């Protein structure tokens, strides 16, 4: 934490900064206090703890103070936060440890199983970002993916469709959708 504060401020500051830290919606008060204490120890003057779905809603331009419910699904790298927000606070929420990194791993497994192709996490993430889909789309996109052929050990290029990414991500997506349903109930 201290490293990031110094990196953001450089050597030009004389005052300790005010810092907002985002935490997943499911963290306990003890965990929030630990994050707050660590931030103070790293050099903060003032610390605000904000739940990630609230920060995501504000970042998306949603007026969270209104008396209407807004569902936020924040899929990060390591966790996904699902929340219903109204009147400036969280009405109901859930946080699961299934997120973007799991999508990448699912794509790596799919490419290995379906195409006998070994690809790295970076290639999987690139594929996810460029043509990844969690539902069948009217227009199918394609991308050439390079990796190592697991049979010959030689480099190989495979043309992958957005339909294949939907298949690769189906199970992981279903777990997030299941959590969305539980939040709505």
Show the residue positions of the predicted features:
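Conserved Rossmann-like nucleotide-cofactor binding loop
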Residues: 78
């Amino acid at each position: 934490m201290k490293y990031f504060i110094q990196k953001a401020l450089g050597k030009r500051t004389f005052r300790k900064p005010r810092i907002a830290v985002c935490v997943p919606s499911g963290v306990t008060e003890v965990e929030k206090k630990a994050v707050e204490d660590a931030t103070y120890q790293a050099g903060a003057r003032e610390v605000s703890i904000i739940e990630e779905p609230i920060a995501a809603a504000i970042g998306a331009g949603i007026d969270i103070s209104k008396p209407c419910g807004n569902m936020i699904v924040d899929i990060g790298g390591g966790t996904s936060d699902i929340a219903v927000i109204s009147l400036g606070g969280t009405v109901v929420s859930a946080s699961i440890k299934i997120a973007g990194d799991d999508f990448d791993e699912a794509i790596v497994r799919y490419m290995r199983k379906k195409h006998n192709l070994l690809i790295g996490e970076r290639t999987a993430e690139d594929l996810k970002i460029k043509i990844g889909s969690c539902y069948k789309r009217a227009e199918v996109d394609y991308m050439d993916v390079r990796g190592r052929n697991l049979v010959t050990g030689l480099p190989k290029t495979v043309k992958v469709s957005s339909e294949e990414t939907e298949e690769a991500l189906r199970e992981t997506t279903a777990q997030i959708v299941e959590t969305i349903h539980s939040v709505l109930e």
